[in-house]
Regions:
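Active-site-proximal or metal-binding-adjacent scaffold patches in catalytic folds
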Residues: 1-190, 200-236
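Walker B catalytic acidic pair
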Residues: 196
């Protein structure tokens, strides 16, 4: 039960309760939930969310903003994370070639004529392309593993450039992940995968949902805490 509001850059879940007498808007672990009396009309729920959307965006933003990664210059020798390990950026002169990961190095090949700001821009572009592909590959593999454990089959696995969320699962079984997660530890990626795959059985954040997550990953709270504290560091 998730009403749609145009131009809203976060999703929210509606939980209806016969015991609830008033409307309540809450944020837990980066997820927005509105708890309302059973017969509350959607228009009243939407009005509440619209009224407090700036507050919600602020709170969600705070979770992704602490601490922040230092801006990159995209020059040789800089360090970039991949699956929690630092990789040194190496720039080689030659014909255009896709970025390659060689050991603990990310190797970009560019023409010698490309210098200054144009070179840095191209390096950033190559890095972004590589991270998107690497993230998709990792998430497809990990989603397959966790889906099999639950006996579910997602209809689509994709990566996106989310600003305020780490993943989502539609009621149709389409799972999307924030590609930046591939920068951090593999265990944190696994937590988000376990979280989203669990939504295929429980499309909410009820106690039953969290029990499924815990069955898949008993120490999920550790990964959750890491993400809440260091999520803002996942940037290139």
């Amino acid at each position: 039960d998730m009403p749609k509001i145009p131009d809203l850059d976060f999703d929210f879940e509606v939980k209806r309760s016969a015991r609830r007498k008033t409307l309540c808007l809450q944020i837990r672990d980066g997820h927005v939930q509105v708890v309302v009396p059973t017969r509350t009309p959607d228009r009243q729920i939407n009005a509440l969310v619209k009224k407090h959307k700036d507050w919600v965006n602020k709170k969600l933003g705070e979770q992704l903003a602490r601490p922040k990664a230092a801006p990159k210059a995209y020059v040789a020798g800089e360090r970039f994370g991949y699956l929690g390990a630092e990789h040194r950026l190496k720039i080689v002169e030659g014909a255009h070639w896709p970025l390659e990961r060689v050991g603990q190095e990310l190797v970009v090949t560019l023409p010698a004529r490309l210098q200054g700001a144009a070179r840095c821009s191209k390096v950033k572009e190559r890095l972004h392309e590589w991270y998107l592909l690497a993230a998709l590959e990792q998430f497809q593999e990990r989603t397959d593993i966790y889906s099999r454990r639950l006996g579910v089959t997602p209809t689509l696995v994709q990566v996106k450039s989310y600003k305020r969320r780490w993943g989502s699962c539609s009621t149709g079984g389409e799972i999307s992940y924030n590609w930046r997660l591939v920068i951090g530890p593999a265990e944190v990626m696994d937590y988000v995968v376990a979280h989203e795959v669990s939504h295929m059985l429980e499309h909410n954040h009820s106690p039953a949902f969290w029990r499924i997550v815990e069955d898949l990953m008993p120490n999920y709270r550790e990964q959750q805490a890491w993400l809440n504290k260091f999520g803002g560091m996942l940037a290139i």
